[in-house]
């Protein structure tokens, strides 16, 4: 969400950023709606003040037995009621349109973010690790994780497809244990060494939680909802069914006919569906949603910041915009585990906290001795709510390229405004918007893929990184032949 006052003061600056996201003219539209809203509010307030004044004068006129004046004033009050109703309607309309517009507009990038249209505009910041020193680095044609998983008998995409469809997997045996070990290792690292507080949050959230972090309303198609109902499609079906049973209704008694008509009425069905939707939830696409919303509508003391939270949870994504991409294997799944990092801090500390978060994510890859590079994303490749984002990309030998494994973003006060999350400075009464940051520390499934591929040897064994061996009961390798 954006500060309309800031947009009003410098619309060209905002429009310059939004035009690159296909929203040219959005700033001018926001200013126009804001002007309509304020004009309606002024009209309403003036009419209310005039009505109150006239109401007092009516009493005075009646006390003086001046019936003509009292009648004139009463007519004036009645007229003002119409003005107030019109102004209130205009206020509600402009307010709703302005809120909808602001909710649909992405965050403004930080000045140091490079301009660009897509991933080709991202800037590499650094690289770490040497893939040739790992077991897979000695192979001419390293296998991908799908073939490795099949050889180990621990990765079954067909069984998952039979029960859930595409983009799911059943992990078994040593691979399932390795996945669990990776998640526990990451969580211990972030809590014990990096000082994050472990949280076990809800996996189901309401609309307002996803609105707060920016997934709704724009990205509903990428989410899984527990309840779905299309009222428009229902209306068409209702009309067809009502026509078909119309003649049958005439044969019922008046009492039964009226009861049945009500139960079949659009008003009743709409009310019932709305009630169901209000009770519905969404599966979280990332624990960022649950962790960040902990401070929703809260006023936090400055002494409590930075607040660093982490959670190991499943994440659920519909991947609506990913048709045809990464259809093989575990790179892009509807359900996957991830260790999420969230920081709540002050504006003056958010940049330093961002750099720290990136280092916390990088440490996971360093301890696993997985080669990676860190990228600063350009304006066209950043997410909706981010003002600055770093991606970590891990080396996958089967693809001979780096692939994203973590994304760490500073959202500034963008999410805080949507959630009304504030902090209070020492000695002050008022509140200031917090800054929120989030990142993966890391995606467990993609880390599993990277370990399998980078630590395979010519005999088909998977060597277990030293950092994971304590979580695997001391096992040093799985599968294959010595």
Curated annotation (Swiss-Prot):
Location, primary (coarse class): cytoplasm
Residues the record lists as binding ATP: 317-319, 404-407
Catalytic reactions of this protein: tRNA(Ser) + L-serine + ATP = L-seryl-tRNA(Ser) + AMP + diphosphate + H(+); tRNA(Sec) + L-serine + ATP = L-seryl-tRNA(Sec) + AMP + diphosphate + H(+)
Keywords: Aminoacyl-tRNA synthetase, ATP-binding, Cytoplasm, Ligase, Nucleotide-binding, Protein biosynthesis
GO biological process: selenocysteine biosynthetic process; seryl-tRNA aminoacylation
EC id: 6.1.1.11
Comp. bias regions, Basic and acidic residues: 1-18
Location of the region described as Disordered in the Swiss-Prot/TrEMBL record: 1-26
Positions annotated to bind L-serine: 286-288, 340, 440
A GO CC annotation given for this chain: cytoplasm
Entry annotated with the keyword Cell inner membrane: no
Keyword Zinc found: no
InterPro entries registered for this protein in UniProt: aa-tRNA-synt_IIb, aa-tRNA-synth_II, aa-tRNA-synth_II/BPL/LPL, Ser-tRNA-ligase_type_1, Ser-tRNA-synth_1_N, SerRS_1_N_sf, SerRS_core, tRNA-bd_arm
CDD domains to which the protein is assigned, alphabetical: SerRS_core
Subunit and partners: Homodimer. The tRNA molecule binds across the dimer.
Family, as annotated: Belongs to the class-II aminoacyl-tRNA synthetase family. Type-1 seryl-tRNA synthetase subfamily.
Domain text: Consists of two distinct domains, a catalytic core and a N-terminal extension that is involved in tRNA binding.
Protein name: Serine--tRNA ligase
